[in-house]
Amino acid sequence: MNNRLLLSVEEYLSLFPLIVRNENLEDNQLQLERKKQALTTFILRAQSMIDDCVASNGGAGFIYSWFDDLKTTDYQKTKFKEAIATLTNYLWLQGHFIDKDYTSAIGDGLSLSFKSENADFEKKRLDIINKLRVCGLYKKSKFANFNDDGIYVNYDELKINAINNVHEELRDHYISKNNPVVNNNFDLNHHNINNVSSINASGNLATLNGFILNDCTLPNDLTTDKSNKVYDNAIANYVDIHDVKNLAWYGQNNNNAITRQELYEYCNKINSKMYWDAIYDYKAGELVYDLDEKTNTIKVYKALVNNGVSTHNIVDPSKQINENVWELINIQQIDLNKIKEGVQDAVDNKVNEVKKAIDTKENTFTKNLENKVNEAKQAVLSSYEQDKASGVFKGEKGEPGIQGPIGPKGETGPKGEKGDSANVDALTSNLESFKNTALNRNVRFPWKIMDNLNKII
């Protein structure tokens, strides 16, 4: 049994707002309480399953050998990864983030790191994780094969209740393109998880800590015996259970428990693909707390033997405690109303503490940032003034301006007097001689001068 399910009496009392079934509540309130219980129980079990599958010691050995076994088909491996994805997707939809690739421990697998390329979503996701850290919900990974600071969620029902308001702000983002598990069709609309009493001997489906992933149907043995009542540990809770007959919490209200056939029909009715059995294997010495709502008492039982799947029920069909299996060690009278009020106060206080801690950190960061910005501004201004005084910013001489437009044409001058014919002929002769002399000496004139000479001559 996972240690996170072993609670002291005080801790158990603190959880009553999540598990109490008060039929005097309004329908919507009753629905909310049942959903809370279903969520809490499922998360605990799902986290335990994931932990067991990737732990580097203990009972995880069969996972490694199972993946390496040549008899294990690709189909089985795929189903196993789909089961991991389905579990993780459910946690994601409830706002609980697993920030590590858990399947890295078993080789080629599915990434469960929900980082997003969408900057706005990623900022909110990291903000939620930081708030979870402040609440104490995150801590460093216990797995030896993770050599970095990988973290995993330590699920505590009271704290989950305390942070309901925190992850509410991401509600619109849960089912979106930013959720890789939803996008690869491993979501709740495609698969369901069914419990089997032992590892599937035929090996036709992948197993996950006693669970198998089946294709949207319940095994036949869950539907044939209509007289078989579903007791507390045979079926604890599942999603959207609010309009089903009352299910018990550790053995109460068994007369109202639904049959397997009724459960099967109900799942079909609401098109729900998520179904699971909360069968726990108790070890000798472990404690179980039984809430009796009719008498407002808590009964504490101690397991006397290591219980296998065939003896897991605290209450047998005759409603008599098996004294060879369980020992009643304590009965405590309780006031559910006071407990509920007290826990709500504790939740409110915890939320306020978290908000205060976050606000303090944010205010400190903002103030430090403003100081840094002001220092940078002052340094730039000071440097500018110094450079300005030293003439660094004195401009060089500019380029000449553009030439103005050409002025109007002047008036025609008076006609010149007629020259001496002899003088003109002499001038022409001299110019011709000058030209010929220049050409003979290979003197190069600009083409305009030569042109003028030719015109004159």
UniProtKB/Swiss-Prot annotation:
Gene3D superfamilies: 6-Phosphogluconate Dehydrogenase, domain 3. Residues 390-423 are annotated as: Disordered. It comes from the Bacteria. This is Uncharacterized protein UU162. It comes from Ureaplasma parvum serovar 3 (strain ATCC 700970).
